[in-house]
């Protein structure tokens, strides 16, 4: 039987789903208003399918504002949260990436066989008389896709604006930007050709980072007119603190 492997067809998967849902609620009165939204996005990768490359995002946002004492004082807040979870294939570069091997590997080389020394179901061309330089792009992709990334970000602020007299506005805003991310990966021992192998050691890696930025901004502005001229003045200060 002549082997005729369509490597491109093997790498790409049909019917990769994308799902997107959102819910928004808005309301208010003469002195108050609010806006709330929820969202979810899921996208399966067309290369390798959902078990190899998959993206999920959850997001939440809420904004409110209230006017007090006949608009003399205005207070409010903004808050948003985003959580992203994804797995993905190795991107590499123009010379070495997951898909490049699929374009150059011989169609006479099979995807699966029982000749792999590490009990992998994917074919190893090392001992082939003709194709030992060809790797197994599908086997490489499925073996090296053991990674998971989690990212979350929280942005929020509260503010107050005071107008003691007409055209004079004094405003104070305190905000925080918090982030946290984690990445985990696992690479087993493998061999797929004389050039594509990892026989040194199994490796596991985990990275984590988090931090936040706090910002406090205070401004005072006064608007007035002189004849046909409109003039705006403002003074302010801002303090920023970062930790991470």
Segments predicted by a language model, with ranges:
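Surface-exposed loop/interface segments of Gram-negative outer-membrane beta-barrel transport/assembly proteins
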Residues: 1-3, 46-53, 59-155, 173-244
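Charge-patterned, long linear interaction tracts outside catalytic cores
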Residues: 157, 161, 168-174
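Residues embedded in well-ordered regular secondary structure
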Residues: 1-54, 141-144, 160-165
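Outer-membrane beta-barrel strand-turn architecture
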Residues: 28-29, 68-70, 162-168, 224-227
């Amino acid at each position: 039987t002549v082997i005729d492997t369509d490597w491109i067809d093997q790498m790409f998967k049909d019917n990769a789903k994308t799902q997107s849902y959102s819910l928004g609620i808005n309301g208010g009165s003469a002195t108050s208003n609010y806006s709330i939204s929820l969202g979810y996005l899921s996208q399966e990768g067309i290369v390798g399918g959902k078990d190899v490359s998959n993206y999920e995002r959850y997001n939440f946002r809420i904004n409110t504002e209230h006017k007090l004492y006949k608009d003399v004082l205005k207070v409010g807040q903004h808050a948003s949260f985003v959580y992203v979870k994804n797995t993905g294939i190795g991107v590499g570069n123009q010379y070495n990436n997951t898909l490049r091997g699929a374009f150059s590997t011989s169609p006479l080389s099979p995807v699966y066989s029982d000749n792999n020394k590490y009990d992998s179901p994917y074919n190893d061309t090392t001992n082939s008389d003709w194709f030992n330089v060809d790797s197994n792009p599908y086997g490489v992709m499925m073996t090296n896709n053991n990674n998971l990334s989690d990212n979350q970000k929280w942005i929020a602020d509260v503010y107050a604006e005071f107008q003691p007299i007409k055209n004079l506005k004094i405003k104070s805003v305190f905000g925080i930007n918090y982030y946290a991310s984690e990445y985990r990966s696992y690479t087993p021992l493998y061999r797929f050709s004389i050039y594509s192998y990892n026989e040194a050691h199994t490796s596991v890696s985990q990275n984590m980072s988090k931090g936040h930025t706090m910002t406090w901004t205070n401004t005072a502005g006064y608007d007035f007119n002189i004849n046909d001229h409109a003039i705006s003045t403002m003074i302010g200060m801002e303090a920023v603190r970062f930790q991470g």
